[in-house]
From Swiss-Prot:
<feature type="binding site">
    <location>
        <begin position="108"/>
        <end position="109"/>
    </location>
    <ligand>
        <name>pyridoxal 5'-phosphate</name>
    </ligand>
</feature>
<dbReference type="InterPro" id="IPR001917">
    <property type="entry name" value="Aminotrans_II_pyridoxalP_BS"/>
</dbReference>
<keyword id="KW-0663">Pyridoxal phosphate</keyword>
<comment type="pathway">
    <text>Cofactor biosynthesis; biotin biosynthesis.</text>
</comment>
<comment type="similarity">
    <text>Belongs to the class-II pyridoxal-phosphate-dependent aminotransferase family. BioF subfamily.</text>
</comment>
<feature type="binding site">
    <location>
        <position position="233"/>
    </location>
    <ligand>
        <name>pyridoxal 5'-phosphate</name>
    </ligand>
</feature>
<dbReference type="GO" id="GO:0009102">
    <property type="term" value="P:biotin biosynthetic process"/>
</dbReference>
<dbReference type="InterPro" id="IPR004839">
    <property type="entry name" value="Aminotransferase_I/II_large"/>
</dbReference>
<feature type="binding site">
    <location>
        <position position="350"/>
    </location>
    <ligand>
        <name>substrate</name>
    </ligand>
</feature>
<dbReference type="GO" id="GO:0030170">
    <property type="term" value="F:pyridoxal phosphate binding"/>
</dbReference>
<dbReference type="InterPro" id="IPR015421">
    <property type="entry name" value="PyrdxlP-dep_Trfase_major"/>
</dbReference>
<feature type="binding site">
    <location>
        <position position="207"/>
    </location>
    <ligand>
        <name>pyridoxal 5'-phosphate</name>
    </ligand>
</feature>
<keyword id="KW-0808">Transferase</keyword>
<dbReference type="InterPro" id="IPR015424">
    <property type="entry name" value="PyrdxlP-dep_Trfase"/>
</dbReference>
<feature type="modified residue" description="N6-(pyridoxal phosphate)lysine">
    <location>
        <position position="236"/>
    </location>
</feature>
<dbReference type="InterPro" id="IPR022834">
    <property type="entry name" value="AONS_Proteobacteria"/>
</dbReference>
<keyword id="KW-0093">Biotin biosynthesis</keyword>
């Protein structure tokens, strides 16, 4: 088989399964609106949960940072790319979340890959929730450690794995809020079991940080746990991009020595770190935004419960409507778009086979009439 045949067959498999991914060129998108071509859509596919991507103070902080520091960092943080804005942001994140140290990464994907591959050896094991994000499962699979997956959000399933012998160390991996179903992990139970077995817990709280808990401190704070490793990302509630790993002092120093994604990547621009400090202030002071988001979630769920579709058991901004069939989910997404509503159809392999869905994400930027319009169109599609 030639390279051309290999590529052609792989693409055809995705087309045959109605799982072919495409990108849309948009003129601009934020928590409420998306501009594509000449048309404006109500945006129900954004992770901009608090609408901070369009916040004036955050934008001004980036502009001021760019004027002072330029638009790039110029190198890895281990060479010349680590500046005062990076150091200040790390310290403020650590103080806010109650950890001695925070380390910045260019993305949540890079952070998860770096931590799992740097910390584990061949005699270690990684026990991961089977619905963990692709970055976690891929990193675990590529790490030298043995990977075992436990049934989603089932502490008893984790316990059955923990009681089995392991020559090395055990790292349990989960998310605070799961990105496709919007449900939350039972973090207190998972931490209790992990600690009793002498293991460490890693929580990726990409979709919980900024949204849950006092000052938006996230899922772990809300459930009263402090995992040994906490990954937070800035592409959701913070409205920007990037990530940080929160940990103890020796772990941070270890990662600085061994985390290849940290060592060999150009650091985020200092201007971005300036904007993230402004976003952090908005998150900390964002109780009103979080209350607005919760109101939109309650409004949607109350009415969507009457739709002839399975509504996911989510109390978060991620509200999946399960369709099942790949092609039907695409048809409905197109019909919603024709009505001026941007909703994304999520299909395998991103989600398990037979669980194609309309993944609706809500934002504090949405207005009550936006939710009413979405529900009106959904009712029309189903009836």
């Amino acid at each position: 088989m030639s390279w051309q045949d290999k590529i052609a067959q792989g693409l055809q498999r995705r087309r045959d399964a109605a799982a072919y991914r495409t990108r849309q060129v948009n003129e601009g998108a934020n928590g409420r609106w998306l501009q594509s071509g000449e048309r404006q859509y109500l945006n129900f596919s954004s992770n901009d949960y608090l609408g901070l991507s369009q916040n004036d103070e955050v934008i001004a902080a980036w502009q001021q940072g760019a004027r002072r520091y330029g638009v790039g960092s110029g190198g890895s943080g281990h060479v010349t790319g680590y500046s005062q804005p990076h150091a200040r942001l790390e310290q403020r994140l650590a103080d806010w979340l109650g950890y001695p140290r925070a380390l910045l990464f260019i993305s949540g994907y890079a952070a998860n890959q770096a931590v799992l591959t740097a910390l584990t050896d061949a005699d270690d094991r990684i026990l991961a929730d089977k619905l963990s994000h692709a970055s976690l499962l891929e990193a675990a699979a590529h790490s030298p450690a043995q990977l075992r997956r436990f049934q989603h959000n089932q502490p008893e399933a984790l316990q059955n794995l923990l009681i089995k012998p392991c020559q090395g160390q055990t790292l349990v991996v989960t998310e605070g809020v799961f990105s496709m179903d919007g449900d939350s992990a039972p973090l207190a139970a998972l931490q209790q079991q992990t600690s009793a077995a002498g293991g460490w817990l890693l929580v990726d709280d990409a979709h919980g940080i900024g949204v849950h808990g006092e000052e938006g401190r996230g899922s772990c704070w809300l459930q009263g746990v402090q995992p040994e490793l906490l990954v937070v990302t800035f592409g959701k509630a913070f409205g920007l991009s990037g990530a940080a790993v929160l940990c103890q002092e020796p772990v941070a120093e270890y990662l600085l020595q061994y985390a290849r994604h940290l060592i060999y990547s150009t650091a985020m621009p200092p201007a971005q770190a300036c904007a993230l400090q402004a976003a952090l202030r908005q998150v900390q002071q964002g109780d009103a935004l979080r209350q607005q988001l919760q109101q939109r979630i309650r409004q949607f769920r109350t009415a969507a419960a009457h739709l002839p579709l399975q509504l996911g058991a989510s109390k978060t901004a991620i509200q999946p409507l399960l369709v099942g069939d790949n092609q039907q989910s695409l048809i409905w997404a197109e019909q919603l778009r024709a009505a001026g509503l941007w909703v994304t159809a999520i299909r395998p392999p991103t989600v398990p086979p037979g669980s194609a869905r309309l993944r609706i994400t809500l934002s504090a930027a949405h207005q009550p009439e936006d939710i009413d319009r979405l529900l009106e169109v959904l009712y029309g599609l189903c009836h």
